[in-house]
Amino acid sequence: MPTVNQLIRKPRVAPVKRNKVPALQSNPQKRGVCTRVYTTTPKKPNSALRKVAKIRLTNGFEVIGYIPGEGHNLQEHSVVMIRGGRVKDLPGVRYHIIRGLLDTQGVKNRKQRRSKYGAKRPK
């Protein structure tokens, strides 16, 4: 524990709070247009082809968003809505695309956690 004199010489510095989703600019979601839809591979030790899209947002930011769920209909010039939320094993992917909104269709044949994937209630 430092003495009073030590604290006068070198005061305590609060850690800098860094924004994890700067492109949202304090908004819950942002709209954007897909400029490129592609797959990428995750970091070790995982192995897959993860579906991602490069998105030009309405505020001019260009970000990479993850496309959750099985199968999607996105292509270049699709209009999408993104939310915050990183993908731990994909470096640089800090946003998720919201399914079932704008040009993004919901996941077909989804029975559980439907609201997260924009799937309607099955009859």
UniProtKB/Swiss-Prot annotation:
Query: Tell me, what is one Gene Ontology molecular-function annotation carried by this entry?
Result: tRNA binding
3-methylthioaspartic acid modification, residue list:
89
Record-linked CDD domains: Ribosomal_S12
Pfam families linked to this entry: Ribosom_S12_S23
Keyword Ribosomal protein found? yes
A biological process (GO) of this protein is:
translation
Family per UniProt? Belongs to the universal ribosomal protein uS12 family.
Q: HAMAP family per the record?
A: Ribosomal_uS12_B
Subunit and partners:
Part of the 30S ribosomal subunit. Contacts proteins S8 and S17. May interact with IF1 in the 30S initiation complex.
Please state what the protein is called: Small ribosomal subunit protein uS12
**Top-level taxonomy:** Bacteria, Pseudomonadati, Pseudomonadota, Alphaproteobacteria, Hyphomicrobiales
